[in-house]
């Protein structure tokens, strides 16, 4: 499968060191705080918060950290920041479109760190709308294949808003509108199919195929951007073939 799933897998393998792990913890904690502020601090009445807490637990974030973030967000405890979501747009090496999603309490710091990472790694900032039109936010749910067939998964989620089920290596990926992810998770639970992961992200309509050396430049840019604590996600329209992925993972 081209695009997201394959290079996300590669990226996750690259991220398995302590520094990356610490930053991932910080991002998960921030998401819990924002979810609690937006929809209330009761996970049973706030599906987004419930999902963020589950993701944090799965990533082994300590329960105390999770609970403090929930309380800060809900106002039960002082110290919550005024988080804002900001999108930045630009181009990486080889004209690859880059969409950068930040969650920050300091717009000036976020803009400065994103601009510096882009300029030092062959990227250029772009005006709002210059690349975002190429991307669409999609919901996704991942399930482990195990003994399942694509038809098994499709039959379970067809009436829940699923738009597509595709092969993603050792998993099946279900795509939908972002608002249908919860219904799809519920449908899978009813069919006794375990969910590995779910979220929403941005997918590009038009992809740029890259060779391994050019892909490495984009990964360096992504790594530099993700050094900023304000950067939550980086999306690109690069496309990596199985051969290129194998070379990157070698």
Swiss-Prot record:
Residues 1-22 are annotated as: Disordered. It holds the Pfam family Transcrip_reg. GO terms for molecular function: DNA binding. InterPro entries: Integrase-like_N, TACO1_YebC-like_2nd/3rd_dom, TACO1_YebC_N, Transcrip_reg_TACO1-like, Transcrip_reg_TACO1-like_dom3, YebC-like. It is found in: Cytoplasm. One of its GO terms (biological process) is regulation of DNA-templated transcription. Gene3D superfamilies: 1.10.10.200, 3.30.70.980. Keywords: Cytoplasm, DNA-binding, Transcription, Transcription regulation. GO terms for cellular component: cytosol. HAMAP family: Transcrip_reg_TACO1. Belongs to the TACO1 family. This is Probable transcriptional regulatory protein DIP1378.
